[in-house]
Design a protein with these regions (language model features):
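C-terminal secondary-structure termini that scaffold catalytic or DNA-interacting sites
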Residues: 2, 159, 170-172, 176-191, ...
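N-terminal core-binding DNA-recognition domain of tyrosine site-specific recombinases/integrases
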Residues: 2-10, 14-91, 107, 236-244, ...
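Hydrophobic recognition helices of helix-based DNA-binding modules
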Residues: 39-43, 79-87, 195-198, 252, ...
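Short, basic (Lys/Arg/His-rich) helix/loop patches that form interaction surfaces
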Residues: 69, 123, 127-128, 140, ...
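Basic, Lys/Arg- and aromatic-enriched nucleic-acid-binding interface segment
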Residues: 73, 88, 92-93, 98-150, ...
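The DNA-recognition helices of helix-turn-helix-type DNA-binding domains
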Residues: 104, 154, 202, 269, ...
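Catalytic-site neighborhood detector that most strongly recognizes the C-terminal catalytic loop/helix
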Residues: 112, 168, 288-314
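Short, polar N-cap/turn motifs at the start of nucleic acid-interacting alpha helices
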Residues: 154-161, 260, 279-299, 327
Length: 365
């Protein structure tokens, strides 16, 4: 029988990681393995029974020098699992992680694209596959991992429906992570127009065989499917979200003169633009694959003031007759050209030019 009193931290970290293989998604397992490797280097071959609470606090001091709280909390997941495993085996009495709570992580504010930025992206020449994917992401709110796994078998153009059945995470096609994520997405007229254009590009492509990891993180089902979006550089479906970001999205933003952010912000843009327009929060949540509006409130939605309707005037018009007062009617704005938008963005990027223009305008009689 194994002498558990002689087991090291490395022994139990390995046991914990092994136990996770079929319990968590592959991407989570990769994260756990990465954190476990760093922890094994830190503790080395220290006996698991020799590690005390003070050692854990010293570790945190070291981690705080290099990592954000969110990442340190990911280390905690591995630590808790490792010591819990050891305690269950009787190798230790009490886990040194007992009563250790996660650190407060800073909330990362969404950074959705404004209408002016979206117009600039739309007006910039680039890979049509990538541009169509970008626009579809804004119009449907799906995850980028779901978008690059989208196939023509998932789309019913006549019924204006799209089904989210799988995602591409790292190197694996897998079923979506929650029951709500496997869903039907309504397609509006704009989305239909984009898909009809994309159909001409990939509708004739041969079906590809893929293996889809199921929700038990063990079973796999083979499928033959025609993918909607291709990487024009490889003439193959995008490998994963990181490739989409690197080969298309980042350079395309630079070309359009739009501030860089990750492709995940396209999903945020769907939520934020629709919230700002006063569209039902429940509908937004359902389209995005959430069972309620909590995630829209907490994580995805952000009020885009520059694109919001004039609600103050609308409020005044609503009560004007009540107080026997008159309110001026809203002035309809003509469509702003993409050239004008580009000019404004260029001036904003160079304050010295903006100051010069303001001086010239101010000097006019």
């Amino acid at each position: 029988m194994e002498n558990r009193n002689q087991n090291t931290f490395t022994d139990y970290a390995d046991k914990f990681i092994k136990s996770r293989k079929f319990r968590v998604a592959p991407s989570t397992l990769v994260n756990n393995k990465c954190k476990a490797s760093a922890l094994k280097r830190y503790f080395g071959e220290t006996l698991i029974s020799d590690i005390c609470h003070s050692d854990i606090l010293d570790l945190f001091d070291d981690l705080h020098e290099r990592y954000a709280n969110k990442t340190i909390n990911e280390f905690m997941t591995v630590l808790r699992g490792t010591f819990k495993h050891a305690a269950s085996d009787g190798a230790i009495g009490v886990s040194p992680m007992l009563d250790v709570k996660n650190f407060k992580a800073c909330k990362v504010e969404p950074k959705p694209f404004s209408k002016a930025e979206l117009n600039s992206l739309h007006s910039t020449h680039g890979c049509l596959h990538g541009k169509h994917a970008l626009i579809m992401n804004v119009l449907t709110g799906v995850r980028i991992s779901e978008l690059i796994a989208l196939t023509w078998e998932d789309i019913d153009l006549k019924r204006k429906e799209m089904f989210v059945r799988r995602a591409k995470v790292l190197s694996d096609y897998k079923t979506p992570k929650t029951e709500e994520s496997i869903r039907k997405v309504e397609l509006n007229e704009l989305a239909i127009q984009v898909l009809l254009k994309q159909l001409k590009l990939t509708g004739h492509k041969a079906a590809r065989e893929i293996s889809v990891l199921q929700s038990d993180n063990k079973s796999r089902i083979k499928e033959h499917l025609q993918f909607v979006f291709y990487n024009s550089q490889t003439d193959a479906p995008f490998i994963h979200a990181a490739q989409f970001n690197k080969t298309f999205f980042k350079p395309f933003l630079e070309k359009a003169g739009v501030e860089h952010r990750g492709a995940g912000q396209l999903r945020h843009t769907f939520a934020s633009q629709n919230l700002t327009a006063g569209i039902s929060k429940e509908w937004i949540a359902r389209q995005m694959g959430h069972s309620d509006t909590a995630m829209v409130d907490k994580h995805y939605g952000k009020w885009i003031a520059v694109d919001s309707p004039d609600y103050a005037s609308a409020s005044a018009r609503n009560l004007s007759s009540t107080f026997d007062m008159k309110v001026s009617e809203p002035v309809s704005m003509t469509e702003i050209s993409s050239e004008f938008v580009a000019l404004i963005q260029a001036l904003q990027a160079k304050p010295e030019l903006l100051t010069l223009v303001q001086t010239l305008v101010g000097s006019q009689p």
